[in-house]
């Protein structure tokens, strides 16, 4: 059984995530004090029910040791996973402005900007041990729920999921990435007027990139690097490995390379997902 702990900065989508998990059959509890986690897990273990619990800055323990002790006291029947939701500062400010809700730390007479920054510092112990960090800055409510359903229902328990995502540097580097590879030095289909409207998912763009030796070399060396360290990452009790591939706009080169790497590791029997940030943004 899974004990999914949902945390993250206020306004990043914890309530949405908890509702999505409830739809997936999890027994959900909002804002449970950390010290009560073992007791809840023992109660649910008798009923063979997976659980999801949200923890925010209001019920954070005073020291990380309290959280570690609670994790160590969980029944063996439960496999704990920590999901951390985040968004960039400007997005959080905009969301609070749209909803006109008060930030949980506003009672300390802090400005909204200062409350967001302080919350980030207070939640760092949880963020640093998260199994999965999700950046919701560019996601709608429905996109976040669907992404969680895909990632959580599409993976086998305790198996590392490799996530290959493309992005454009001009839109910013994904904060959920474990590895970031820059492919802006590779030949750019953008300068071919016929290829410019297309994406890295289209065959003419793929054929253009496939003609260049340096593209093949990059794919080979990148997958070799990942293959070298993958066994150690798998034995390190990780649930996800997110590899971000970036080009200038996130439309051609990064999309093609991310798909090539995803196809390669998928053919090797790995649990693989792919995502293209710029293309998803264009659809929304």
UniProtKB/Swiss-Prot annotation:
GO terms for molecular function: ATP binding; GTP binding; RNA binding. ATP binds at residues 8-15. GTP binds at residues 56-59. The keyword RNA-binding applies. Keywords: ATP-binding, GTP-binding, Nucleotide-binding, RNA-binding. Transmembrane segments: none annotated. Residues 266-284 are annotated as: RNA-binding. It comes from the Bacteria. Homotrimer. Belongs to the RapZ-like family. RapZ subfamily. Modulates the synthesis of GlmS, by affecting the processing and stability of the regulatory small RNA GlmZ. When glucosamine-6-phosphate (GlcN6P) concentrations are high in the cell, RapZ binds GlmZ and targets it to cleavage by RNase E. Consequently, GlmZ is inactivated and unable to activate GlmS synthesis. Under low GlcN6P concentrations, RapZ is sequestered and inactivated by an other regulatory small RNA, GlmY, preventing GlmZ degradation and leading to synthesis of GlmS. NCBIfam families: PRK05416.1 (NF003828). PANTHER family: RNASE ADAPTER PROTEIN RAPZ. HAMAP family: RapZ_like. This is RNase adapter protein RapZ. It comes from Cronobacter sakazakii (strain ATCC BAA-894). The lineage of its organism: Bacteria, Pseudomonadati, Pseudomonadota, Gammaproteobacteria, Enterobacterales.
């Amino acid at each position: 059984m899974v004990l999914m702990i949902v945390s993250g900065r206020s306004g990043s989508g914890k309530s949405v995530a908890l509702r999505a998990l409830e739809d997936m059959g999890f027994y959900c509890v909002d804002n449970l004090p950390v010290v009560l986690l073992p007791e809840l897990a023992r109660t649910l273990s008798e009923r063979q029910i997976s659980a999801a619990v949200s923890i925010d800055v209001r019920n954070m323990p005073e020291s990380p040791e309290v959280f570690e002790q609670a994790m160590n006291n969980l029944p063996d029947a439960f496999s704990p996973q920590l999901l951390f939701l985040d968004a960039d500062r400007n997005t959080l400010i905009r969301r609070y402005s749209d909803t006109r809700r008060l930030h949980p730390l506003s009672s300390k007479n802090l400005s909204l900007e200062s409350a967001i920054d302080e919350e980030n510092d207070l939640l760092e112990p949880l963020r640093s041990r998260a199994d999965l960090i999700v950046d919701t800055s560019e996601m709608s409510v429905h996109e976040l729920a669907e992404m969680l359903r895909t990632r959580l229902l599409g993976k086998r328990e305790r198996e590392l999921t490799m996530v290959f995502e493309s992005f454009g540097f001009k839109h910013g580097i994904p904060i959920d990435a474990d590895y970031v590879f820059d492919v802006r030095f590779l030949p750019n289909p953008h300068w071919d007027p016929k290829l410019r409207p297309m994406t890295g998912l289209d065959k003419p763009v793929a054929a253009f990139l496939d003609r260049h030796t340096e593209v093949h070399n990059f794919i080979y060396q990148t997958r070799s690097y990942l293959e070298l360290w993958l066994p150690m990452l798998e034995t390190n009790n990780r649930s996800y490995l997110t590899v971000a591939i970036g080009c200038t706009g996130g439309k051609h080169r990064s999309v093609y390379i991310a798909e090539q790497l995803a196809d390669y590791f998928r053919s090797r029997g790995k649990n693989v997902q792919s995502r293209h940030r710029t293309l998803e943004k264009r659809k929304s």
